[in-house]
Amino acid sequence: MTINYIRYFIFMMLIFVACTKDEYEGPSLQSLYGEFSLLSPFSITNLNPDFSNNEMVKFHCEFNKSVDWKITIRGLQTGSMKEITGFSNRIDSGLVSWNGNTSEVPFFSEETCALELTFLTELDTLRDTLTISGKK
């Protein structure tokens, strides 16, 4: 009878050890319900772009969880606007860039532009400015 208990115990331990997962399925609870924070600041590669020379403006920022984000670029003289949106935990300067185009008319001219990074589900807003030195 004792041998059966030992076998049963060993069998149950093997099942318990065999059924543990090394990786979780789906997103972590931190990324769903955790507090939002920046891991790296919002940075802009070119604060004086000359779009007539095909220069680009690239953006970079990292967060602790995936969020819906939006970069809004607004010309302070013309009122022109460009929006760039995405859902991720990172704005990668290799993927997110601006070449001077617009989302709606009028077009950008040589002017100062206000940049705003906002998040759909968070209260944080990051702001900066750049000056266009050559229009597209």
Outline where the language-model segments fall:
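Sec-dependent signal peptide recognition
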Residues: 4-11
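C-terminal motif of bacterial Sec signal peptides marking the signal peptidase cleavage site
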Residues: 15-18
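Acidic/polar, low-complexity intrinsically disordered N-terminal segments immediately downstream
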Residues: 21-95, 101-114, 120-127, 134-136
